[in-house]
Amino acid sequence: MATGFPFSTGDVLSASAANGFTAFTCNTAATTDYTAVLNDQYQVIQQMNKATAIAFKIPTNASVAFAVGTVITVLNIGAGTCTISAVTSGTTTVLSAGATAAAPTLAQYKSAACIKVATDTWYVVGAIA
């Protein structure tokens, strides 16, 4: 089972690693559509900042193999609505309203957590519409 942190059995926990558990890493605000990359996992806030509509895309497992249990937090600080969706909707499923695939949106100053629950299935929870 994924622990949510990139450690393996036998690793020694340093003070700096332990301190990292209490702080989120904030990426530079994206001003264009953004597709998640492997470095976005583990306590990352991906900021979106555009005056008009913008998209946060979740890639297929074949292109970016996030571990099941990965959480990516998305924060929309721009005035434009941010849509969270799959790069390939026929392969990756984004769920926010039960079992029906959806593309939830975030208004300005709202956030959501994208949680990988299976190979190509993500739940999106938070201040979504």
PLM regions: where:
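Generic beta-strand structural signal
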Residues: 8, 77, 116-117
